[in-house]
Amino acid sequence: MAESRAERKARRALIEAAEGSEDRKSSKKSKSPQDAKGKSAKGKAKAKRPGSRRNEDKASQTRSKRPYKNPVPSARKAVDPKSPCSIMKACGGCTALNRPYKKQLAAKQTAMEELFAALCGREGISVDPIRGMGVTLGDPGKYPAPRGFRHKAATPFAPGKEGAVRCGFFERGTHRIVAVPECPVETPGARQILNGIAREAERLRIPAFNEDKHLGLLRYAVVRCGWRTDQVMVTLVTAQRDLPHAQEFFEAVAALNPHIVTVAQNINGRPGNAILGEETRIVYGAECMRDQLLGCEFDISPTAFYQTNPQQTELLYQLAIDGMDLQQGDVLMDAYCGSGTIGLCAAKDAQNKGIGIMLLGVERNPAGIADARRNAELNGLTRSAWFMADDATDCILDAADNNERVDVLSIDPPRAGSTPEFLEAACALKPRRITYISCNPVTQERDLHQLLDGGYRLLKITPVDMFPHTDHTETVAVLERR
C-alpha cells in the first residue's frame, strides 16, 4: 500500500529534523556523576489477534500489509569538533545532537502538524505545541540541550583480540562495535557499569558471544537506573546458563556500583538480534528495583516494560490523566497496560482528589500483569484495581459483546497501533472519554480516523519529545463521545 500524502510529509519533515535541512535554509551562523541509579522470565502467550504489547520496544504484528516505515536519516558527513559526543558520526543514534534544541522541536512540530492536518481540519482544532524537556515550543528564553535523560542503557558484547571483550554501540548500519567511554544522553554512571562488566568478564575469562560463529557466552548487558530513587538493576544476557566463575562474576558486577540492588541473568541461546530470551533468574539481590512516577511507586522486574525517559513519561502520563477527566464511580479500562503504570497513576491521582474509580488493566504478557498486581498493592489500590492477562482486542470484544460498562478508555498500543476490531469494539462500548498514547504517530493518525467515524470527536493532540536529538516523537490524543 502506498504511503498517504500526510505520511510522506511527516517522513520528510522528520528527516529534516535530524539532518538539519532547516539550518541550511537559514543563516549559517550558530550561536555526580550521578550514581547510576528488577524477576521472573518474561511471559510468553500467543494472542488470537495482533495489537498488544509484546516487549519493551512495543514490537507487534501490524494489521496492514504495508509495514510501518520509520525514516532513518543519514548521519551528517561531518561532526562539529565541539560536539558533546566523540562517536556521534559512527554511532548515528542522536543524529540531531549538534542541532539547537529549539530547532529540533520546531521541526518535529511541523512534522506533527502535517501528519495530523486532515484530522485537525476535520475537527477544527490545531496540534498543541510540542512539549520538550523542560520547555514547551513557543516559550521565551533559552532552550537548553537535554542531557542524561535515558535511564536505561545497554551494550552488546563481542570478542576482541587475545580474549578481550568489546562493548559499546553498534556502528551505524553495521554490527561492528564502537567503544563508548561515556554517552551524553544516558544517565551518568550507567555506561561505566557496562564497561566495567566487560572488564570483569575479561578478568575471569568469560568469552564474549560471537554472533557469526554462534560461539561464546556473554551477549548483552542492560542497566536500568531509578529516577526518583538511586536504585540500579543489571541484566546480563548470556547464551547459556552455566558460566565459568559464575558466582564470582555476579558478585563482581554487583560491586561495580553501590546502588546496584539486583543482578539478573537472562538466557538467550537463540540466533538473531533479539536481546532477551525467555528465561530470567535473579543471581544477586532483590527480585526488582523500585522507582517512582507521579507519586506512585513501581517495582520493575528485569523484563518489565518501563519507559526509558521517566521525566518525559510523567509529562506524557499527566497529559493523558488530565484528558480522562475522571468522575466519581467511573470505570477506567487501561488497555495494553504493561506493568500498570498509566492506570495506577490515574487511579492514584483520582484517589488523591477524593474521587473513587474502578480500574481494569489488560495486558497479554503474564509477567507484566504480575508486576501490575504487585504495584497496585504497593500503592494501596488492590481494592479498586484489577488486572487481566489477556489480549487487549479479545478482552474489549468480550466487554462489548456483554455490554459491559467502561466510562473511560486508555489506549497505549505498540508501534503497529491498535486493531480494527479493537477500535470497533471501543466505539461500541461508548466510553465517555478515550485517551490514546502513541509511540508511532503515523499509526495513531490512522486509528483516530476510525474512532472519529465511530462517534468520537478529537479534543486535542499533544506531541511530546520523549527522545531529544532523534526523529522520534510521541503523542497524546484526547477524544470525547459526540
Where are these regions (language model features)?
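Extended interfacial segments that mediate partner engagement and assembly in macromolecular machines
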Residues: A78-K82, K89-A208, R228, L243
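Short, aliphatic-rich beta-strand segments
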Residues: V223, D230-A239, E297-S301
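Short edge beta-strands and adjacent turn/loop segments
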Residues: H214-R228
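Solvent-exposed residues in well-ordered beta-strands and their adjoining turns
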Residues: P156-A158, R224, V237-A239, E480-R482
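Short beta-strand elements
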Residues: G148-E171, V223-C225, R281, E287-L293, ...
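Rossmann-like S-adenosyl-L-methionine
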Residues: E3-K29, D35-G38, K42-G43, A47-A59, ...
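Nucleotide donor/acceptor-binding cores
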Residues: H151, D230-V232, G329-D330
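Short, acidic/hydrophobic/Gly-rich beta-strand patch recurrent on exposed beta strands
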Residues: G168-E171, V237, A372
